[in-house]
Structures are given as structure tokens and as C-alpha cells.
Curated annotation (Swiss-Prot):
Acts as a lipid transfer protein. Preferentially captures and shuttles two lipid second messengers, i.e., phosphatidylinositol 4,5- bisphosphate and phosphatidylinositol 3,4,5-trisphosphate and increases their levels in the plasma membrane. Additionally, may also function as a lipid-presenting protein to enhance the activity of the PI3K-AKT and MEK-ERK pathways. May act as a regulator of tumorigenesis through its activation of phospholipid signaling. Keywords: Cell membrane, Cytoplasm, Lipid transport, Membrane, Transport. GO terms for molecular function: phosphatidylinositol binding; phosphatidylinositol transfer activity. One of its GO terms (biological process) is 1-phosphatidyl-1D-myo-inositol 4,5-bisphosphate metabolic process. Residues 109-292 are annotated as: Binding to phosphoinositides. This is Tumor necrosis factor alpha-induced protein 8-like protein 3. It comes from Homo sapiens (Human). One of its GO terms (cellular component) is cytosol. InterPro entries: TNFAIP8-like (IPR008477), TNFAIP8_sf (IPR038355). The lineage of its organism: Eukaryota, Metazoa, Chordata, Craniata, Vertebrata. It is found in: Cytoplasm; Cell membrane. Its main location: cytoplasm. Pfam families: DUF758 (PF05527). Widely expressed (at protein level). Highly expressed in most carcinoma cell lines. Residues 81-107 are annotated as: Disordered.
Amino acid sequence: MGKPRQNPSTLVSTLCEAEPKGKLWVNGYAGTQGTRDATLQTRLIPLSFHLQRGKGLAAPLSALSAPRLPERPADGRVAVDAQPAARSMDSDSGEQSEGEPVTAAGPDVFSSKSLALQAQKKILSKIASKTVANMLIDDTSSEIFDELYKVTKEHTHNKKEAHKIMKDLIKVAIKIGILYRNNQFSQEELVIVEKFRKKLNQTAMTIVSFYEVEYTFDRNVLSNLLHECKDLVHELVQRHLTPRTHGRINHVFNHFADVEFLSTLYSLDGDCRPNLKRICEGINKLLDEKVL
């Protein structure tokens, strides 16, 4: 007679000192792997388990696009491939099309919050971590992203391209957040993190200053600051992420640093002025809260 079945509501975590060879055998569970420094961290999660977040329930794991489990061998064990999580995190297999966003409200409604949740669920399907589960884009940042989408759509006259730019921005931000929160950056890279924070803070204050003080706007100054931020991001993730993600970084920063886009955004009598006002209000809030 076989062993009694384990309670599926429990969470089992196994820490292995070294990466296992070949297959990792798990009784009746689907396994996902995460790495922290040189240690392989394997979290075994029942498919019915729900990730808990500070103020409520996050998306259930059963809603994620989980890979099909292999057939159970004669001894009743399930085989799960043991692969490094850093590489899995940067994989985009099974990704939705790059078309316009589709939400419950209809295809013309853009929500950066919804897009961020989709991206996180995709990454969470490859890495099981409570830290990652709690990493949701805050409401203020979400509101800023929504306004950036609107002005990008206004400038490009292309909803599909505007959506793709914001999708790339959110993906890059989440991936960097995962690396940082899971202590994947070396001491040298942490120095780059501090440089990037200072440069981002300088850029944020410049964006607000150019809006609040009329006739001070200089599109070349702001463009150069954004390109400097881009270079620091490339340097930071050089050994962690794939060329595809580096392409996303270029796609995002090259758009927002484009002098023609900046001129449209800061035009005193342009249609984007109300959006710029809300963007700067959000940035000011993040500055006051020491987020930027």
C-alpha cells in the first residue's frame, strides 16, 4: 500500500546545496526552481495553492500557464526538469501576441496595472518566490504609466506600438526588480544600481522642473539624461539578461528620449499638457515618498 497522500494546502520548500544532475523527482507535485547566489532553491507548490499578498489575494497559480506534467512512472513519482531560474526568467516562450491590450472593459482600454500583472504571472510561472509574488507595481507608478501610454499613442498615432513600448517598459522593470530582490547583483553591480538611482532621481526632478517653470524646457538636456539612464541599465543587466531584453531596453528609452516626442509632450498649447501635469504630479509623489 502506498504512502498517505500529503495535504495539498501545504507549501514545501527544499534547499539543495548544489544543482541536481538530470531530473529532480517530486512525489505528486509540480516543481519550479529559483536560484540565489550559488544555491539552488526549489519550491514545491500544489497547483491549487494561492499566492498571498499583503492586502489580499494575488492571482492563483492555477491560472498560470503551467507546462504539461510528464507521465507518472511506475513508482508514482513525477519528473521535473531542474534548470536555472535566471535563464527561465528571461524566456518569453508562450507569450501573448504583441497586439493591442484586451481588458474586461474592451480592446481600447489600456491598463498598466493589468499589463504588469500579466507580466508577473508569466514570470511567476517560471520562478516560485514569495518575494516575487509581492512585487506589484504601485498605484502611483501605474497611473504614470497609463499617462505615458496616452501621450505615446498621441505622438505615434499607433495604439499597437504604444502598447508594445509600455509592455517592454513593464517587463524590463519587473525583471530588474526580481534580480535585485533576490540578491542576484554582485557588489560591482550594486554600485551601478546606486548610480542608476541617482541618475533616475536627477531625471525625475528635471522632468518636473521643466513642467513647473515655464520656458525652461530643453529637450536635448532631458534626452541626454534618459540616454544616460539607458546606458546604466544596459551595464547593470549585461550578464543577467538576453539580447532580446537589451533590445527592449533600447526600444523603451529611445522612444522616451526622442526629442520630437519630448517636444510634443512639453508643448505649452498641445493636447498632451494635461497628461504631463498628471505625470509630474505622480513623479512628485514618488519623490516625496523617496521611491525615486
